[in-house]
């Protein structure tokens, strides 16, 4: 959903668009709630309130002020992520395909021959970091840039088994045009760039679990963040390999040597961060042309000092000469060294050239050892070739993708490796490594052992659901870690599957009720965005690979109506009931009938079941941005921080009724997941509320009326307005509450319209118009620890006779209250009040 705010209406008609005019009779929160439950994707919001826009954005729903038709046209035709704090819109708009172009935000790609392999007549355009160079295309009242690129497809091609780039891109673009937008992946980069600067300002130590290459630029600015990944491939791990020969396989049609070098250096930087938690100076030997340095500098400020007879245009300091052993002394501490020296073969005989390469490899390794031995805080990455070698068993082997698989690999060394045990590695084993192993991640830090860290902030985005992690350990971590942002895969199956397939692995699935947490927000991706100053125009799909975002220790926890709130709670219900259902009242009717309340007159107005809880349960796949458990808990301890809106406080019994309805709904739909979820929420309600029932009552509150429009043979026909189980010493407390509610009780709009047999031998008249007041009184009694109401649903009625009689229907008739009293069952009246 996207909300586009206008001061005046527009003449154009847009598909999937609805107009909402601000209602001045309602406050900003109520307007935001009503907007969020509209069913179209685009909302044109007229006569808007700035506060309402703020509320929507904090809820994760993109809401933007529009000043021109051009702005409106741009935003209505595509999806976007909105930084509502800095007023920046990141479009996810692939309409540039109509210009016969693909886009990249990696400069090195533009220096390759990739355009020779594009679709006929197509070109490649560089658009800068997150599309920053496209800002000049939009002369808008807000900052706007198109963050959509084809880098994901280019990188996927590099790691694929496919060689034909043109056919690969054609297939992927067609897929992109025929499937839904992977909005979370597109906006995740914006989210990470917002998240980690905010966390770093507030937190001393941050642990980040499971980063992938998509994050490799983001973390360059955060050397102190401790990363956990899948660990490195060590020299000693080659013991598992069988010897092989030279393969000579082409990986990419266009030259990706630049990519390989960039990945090697970034891997080395993160390895250095893990050891020393600070930025190094980057020395590079055999550097030309290293166009990728431009990309790294777009994200983070590094000093590059380079040596090569050819130019290295983006180096901070370039020495246009060969590097020699005597230059080692010039290299300072707190640095990394990347050695990428190799003589071009030219016309040299391959046997002669092989001798040169092997000699160069030995020389390179000697340079690396000398560099590491000469100072402190150093890491080296050195180019190697497959040959018989003695190598430190703890050295790290790297083999990032390059244009052709030949005999080249890289060795990552630290100062401890050079003094470690060395092992003889045959050439055939190194060929086996080169032929079969691709380094898929620049993060090669050790794996995370699932345990809590008392003083650290843990971030684990899409990292802990895999079934090689123990599910109980993951739950315990979330329950006990004081400060964290952790995602787990939501159980949106219908058969309550404990795990589901994802690519070539399996993920555990989770529901919010799997966790026993306090001071925690459990929400969706869009709900989480709102907490960190972002909003999004397209919410997560109800099915597929979606995640719960779990925030421990957030200062937003008590701000119940601002973050992870109830906006959009009825949207799915509205979509169904106004399109597919038997009547738009289907939900109301079902909730009453499933609780044995058969008086459906005014069912859409006089509710006995919490619609919030009911919708949050049966449609949780659509509205899990609403943190239901937090909502229940904060109400139970009376610490819900409500800033505004039309606020109705539910009685705890209304929540129980909602669970009962949801369970019956789930049974009819054969939805085992909702069935379990509703059962667990009901248990949670009973846990946090101390609900007691007057199933064996000794007092009741009665209401007598001036006139009953039916024949009756009981002595005093009355409405039993609830029963109580109290000691005589509690009577003054009950009377006090009755007196405090005097005006509301006498002002009830009580009506009746028919009679019926409540049970065999009990003939009654229906009563409408009292439930809202009943539940308000229930709440007051509950807070005073007075047992009021029974476990079965309260069905308001007036007993007319204890004989069987036929049903009588009359015009709806108002009943005028004569008196309201408290009376002991089979005893005397102890309190009476008249109007």
UniProtKB/Swiss-Prot annotation:
Q: Molecular function (GO) terms listed? A: GTP binding; hydrolase activity; mRNA 5'-cap (guanine-N7-)-methyltransferase activity; mRNA guanylyltransferase activity; RNA binding
The protein's organism comes out as Rotavirus A (strain RVA/Human/Japan/AU-1/1982/G3P3[9]) (RV-A)
Sorted alphabetically, which keywords does the UniProt record give?
GTP-binding, Host-virus interaction, Hydrolase, Inhibition of host innate immune response by virus, Methyltransferase, mRNA capping, mRNA processing, Multifunctional enzyme, Nucleotide-binding, Nucleotidyltransferase, RNA-binding, S-adenosyl-L-methionine, Transferase, Viral immunoevasion, Virion
Which EC numbers characterise this protein's activity in its record? 3.1.4.-, 2.7.7.50, 2.1.1.56
Q: Does the keyword S-adenosyl-L-methionine apply?
A: yes
Q: Which residues form the active site?
A: 718 (for 2'-5'-phosphodiesterase activity), 720 (for 2'-5'-phosphodiesterase activity), 797 (for 2'-5'-phosphodiesterase activity), 799 (for 2'-5'-phosphodiesterase activity)
Segments for region (GTase/RTPase activity):
556-692
Q: Does the keyword Acetylation apply?
A: no
Q: What is this protein called?
A: Protein VP3
Q: How does it assemble?
A: Interacts with VP1. Interacts with VP2.
Lineage of the species this protein comes from: Viruses, Riboviria, Orthornavirae, Duplornaviricota, Resentoviricetes
What family does this belong to?
Answer: Belongs to the rotavirus VP3 family.
Query: Which cellular components does GO assign to this protein?
Result: viral nucleocapsid
User: What subcellular compartments does it reside in?
Assistant: Virion
């Amino acid at each position: 959903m996207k909300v586009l705010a206008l001061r005046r209406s527009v003449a154009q008609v847009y598909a999937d668009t609805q107009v909402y005019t601000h209602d001045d009779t309602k406050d900003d929160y109520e307007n935001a709630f009503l907007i969020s439950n509209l069913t179209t994707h685009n909302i044109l919001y007229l006569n808007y309130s700035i506060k309402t826009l703020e509320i929507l954005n904090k809820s994760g729903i993109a809401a933007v002020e529009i000043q021109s038709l051009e702005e409106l046209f741009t935003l209505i035709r595509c999806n976007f992520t909105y930084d509502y704090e800095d007023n920046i819109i990141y479009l996810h708009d692939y309409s540039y395909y109509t210009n016969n172009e693909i886009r990249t935000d990696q400069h090195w790609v533009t220096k390759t021959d990739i355009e020779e392999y594009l679709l006929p007549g197509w070109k490649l355009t560089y658009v800068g970091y997150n599309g920053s160079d496209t800002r000049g295309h939009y002369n808008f009242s807000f900052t706007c840039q198109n963050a959509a690129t084809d880098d994901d497809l280019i990188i996927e091609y590099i790691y694929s088994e496919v060689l034909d780039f043109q056919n690969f891109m054609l297939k992927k673009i067609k897929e992109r045009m025929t499937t839904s937008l992977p909005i979370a992946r597109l906006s995740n980069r914006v989210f990470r760039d917002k998240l980690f600067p905010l966390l770093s300002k507030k937190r001393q130590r941050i642990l980040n679990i499971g980063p992938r290459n998509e994050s490799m630029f983001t973390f360059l600015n955060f050397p102190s963040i401790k990363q956990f990944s899948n660990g490195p491939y060590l020299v000693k791990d080659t013991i598992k390999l069988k010897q092989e020969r030279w393969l000579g396989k082409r990986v990419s049609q266009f030259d990706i040597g630049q990519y390989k070098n960039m990945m090697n250096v970034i891997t080395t930087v993160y390895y250095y961060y893990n050891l020393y938690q600070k930025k190094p100076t980057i020395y590079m030997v055999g550097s030309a042309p290293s166009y990728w340095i431009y990309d790294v500098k777009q994200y983070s400020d590094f000093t590059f000092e380079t040596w090569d007879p050819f130019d290295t245009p983006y180096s901070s300091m370039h020495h246009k000469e060969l590097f020699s052993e005597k230059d080692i002394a010039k290299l300072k501490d707190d640095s990394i060294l990347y050695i990428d020296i190799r003589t071009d073969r030219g016309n040299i005989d391959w046997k002669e050239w092989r001798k040169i390469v092997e000699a160069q490899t030995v020389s390179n390794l000697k340079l690396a050892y000398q560099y590491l031995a000469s100072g402190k805080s150093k890491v080296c990455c050195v180019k190697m070739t497959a040959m018989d070698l003695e190598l430190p068993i703890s050295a790290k082997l790297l083999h990032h993708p390059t244009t052709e698989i030949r005999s080249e690999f890289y060795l990552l060394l630290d100062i401890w490796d050079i003094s470690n045990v060395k092992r003889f590695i045959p050439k055939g084993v190194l060929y086996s490594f080169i032929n079969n192993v691709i380094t898929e991640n620049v993060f090669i830090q050790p794996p995370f052992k699932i345990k809590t860290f008392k003083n650290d902030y843990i971030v684990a985005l899409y990292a802990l659901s895999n079934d090689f992690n123990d599910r109980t350990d993951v739950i315990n971590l979330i329950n006990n870690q004081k400060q964290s942002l952790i995602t787990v895969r939501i159980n949106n199956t219908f058969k309550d599957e404990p795990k589901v397939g994802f690519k070539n692995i399996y993920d555990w699935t989770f529901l919010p009720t799997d966790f026993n947490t306090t001071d925690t927000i459990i929400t969706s991706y869009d709900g989480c965005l709102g907490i960190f100053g972002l909003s999004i125009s397209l919410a997560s799909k109800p099915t597929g690979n979606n995640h719960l975002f779990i925030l421990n220790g957030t200062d937003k926890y008590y701000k119940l109506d601002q973050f992870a709130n109830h906006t959009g709670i009825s949207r799915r219900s509205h979509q169904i009931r106004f399109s597919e259902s038997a009547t738009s009242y289907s939900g109301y009717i079902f909730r009453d009938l499933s609780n044995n309340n058969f008086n459906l007159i005014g069912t859409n107005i006089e509710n006995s079941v919490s619609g919030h809880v009911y919708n949050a349960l049966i449609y949780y796949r659509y509205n899990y941005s609403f943190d239901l458990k937090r909502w229940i808990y904060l109400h139970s301890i009376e610490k819900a921080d409500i800033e505004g809106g039309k606020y109705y406080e539910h009685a705890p019994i209304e929540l129980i009724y909602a669970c009962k309805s949801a369970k019956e709904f789930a049974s009819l739909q054969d939805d085992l997941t909702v069935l379990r979820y509703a059962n667990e929420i009901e248990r949670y309600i009973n846990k946090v509320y101390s609900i007691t029932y007057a199933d064996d009552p000794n007092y009741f509150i009665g209401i007598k009326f001036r006139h009953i429009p039916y024949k009756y043979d009981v002595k005093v026909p009355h409405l039993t307005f609830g029963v109580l189980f109290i000691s005589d010493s509690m009577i003054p407390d009950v009377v006090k509450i009755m007196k405090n509610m005097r005006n509301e009780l006498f002002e009830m709009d009580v009506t009746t319209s028919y009679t019926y047999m409540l049970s065999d031998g009990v003939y009654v008249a229906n009563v409408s118009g009292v439930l809202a007041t009943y539940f308000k009184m229930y709440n007051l009694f509950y807070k005073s620890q007075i047992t009021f109401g029974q476990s079965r649903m309260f069905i308001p009625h007036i007993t007319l006779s204890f004989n069987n009689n036929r049903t009588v229907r009359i015009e709806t008739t108002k009943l005028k209250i004569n008196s309201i009293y408290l009376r002991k069952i089979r005893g005397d009246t102890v309190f009476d009040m008249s109007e």
